[in-house]
């Protein structure tokens, strides 16, 4: 499985979320609401998540091996580094159940 397209919107914010991302896998499957987060060790890609009734955040979709996680990270960060346009954060909202949960879950 390969990342065949990355759509990224950098956002201007005081928070740790720096971009919203959608990826396409094998030109056949799209995953929305990935986020580029500024963590303690630098930027990383967070998977789409949903708040559970007890207030925890759970990934909706995520890679199940480190090779796929690294491929996603590399593809997203390449586009992030090449993107100059930044939009105001009020126009860059993830879907209503996804949130910047600040997780530091790096691969």
Swiss-Prot record:
RNA-binding keyword on record: no
Keyword Cell division: yes
Domain of life: Bacteria
One GO term (biological process): division septum assembly
InterPro entries with a match to the protein in the record: SpoVG, SpoVG_sf
Listed PANTHER family: SEPTATION PROTEIN SPOVG-RELATED
HAMAP family assigned: SpoVG
Protein name, as recorded: Putative septation protein SpoVG
The species this protein was found in: Staphylococcus carnosus (strain TM300)
